[in-house]
Amino acid sequence: MRRMQTFGRTIAAAAVAAAAFGLTACGSKDSETAASATTTVAASSAPAGPTATESKGRECVAEDIGVTGGFGQAPTITIPDDCDPPSTLITKDLVPGSGPGATAGKQLTMNYSLVTWSDKQKLDSSFDRGEPFRLTLGAGMVIPGWEQGLEGVQQGARRLLIIPPDLGYGAGGNGVKPNETLVFVTDAVEVPQG
């Protein structure tokens, strides 16, 4: 008997959750009842605040990302909560460089720090290891967001790269969450001058 009562309560709870989901998925903005029911269920079963899939109404731009520290120093990267990750590659030189810009086939020496968008935490940093990263631009050694985002970078530049999932690690993740937006601050330590 006790098992049947527990089973009955479980089924009833599942029915309430399914109904709330149906209201959320299919309800209109004009339905105060649907909004009220959804809010009540959400408030009792989930933490307050927007979810990762809830749109904030606009995509972030480079100026929304906070970066402290100068060229050669490990940066602190701050991702805001009030905008969505960009759907296209964004690059911005935070510190200008000098000399010729990087082109395909050139070997670059870069320092970088990576923060993942979803959890706003540093995932990797050559600054922390004390050794810059070397790559040949256009040789397929790095993710497409780096290949495209470092094109034209000049020696001495600090460049922000906001890389959407399709130019990063995509659905496979490869050490990050699937479909993760990546935020890099890169320092062009060496760009060939000739």
Residue ranges and their predicted role:
Residues R2-G194:
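Cross-family detector of peptidyl-prolyl cis-trans isomerase
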